[in-house]
Amino acid sequence: MIIRSAYLEGTVAAADRPAFDAHMRGPVMAAIATYPGLRDVRLRELARGEEGAPAVYMVFDLYFDSLADMDAALASATRQAVRATIQMGMRAFQGRVYHLVFSESASTAAP
């Protein structure tokens, strides 16, 4: 399993958070869900940061079966539509966005 994580590192002014969060949870999640080959998309919002941790506001995790599937999705016409939807809400965000790609190598359920 391949996981492409988009980190939004920064802040959103308190007055803008409800609209920003609603845009990310609604239109952005719906747009991302249209990527070809996507198995799952999850949105993680910071519950608490530890001392010294970067100020990550939220993370989108996109799950694909393979790097080839991820690359095909990112090369598709869908990507431009997703980017446009994301950009509509980004005026409220102060910071940077970066991506990391992980391969899931182990998993176990807690007893």
Task: Please name every model-derived segment.
Residues 21-25, 75:
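Amphipathic, non-transmembrane alpha-helical scaffold segments
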Residues 24, 32-33:
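Hydrophobic C-terminal alpha-helix "anchor/cap" residues
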Residues 33-39, 53-55, 63-100, 111:
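An amphipathic, aromatic/His-enriched active-site/gating alpha helix that lines ligand/cofactor pockets
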Residues 45-47, 101-104:
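A general secondary-structure junction signal
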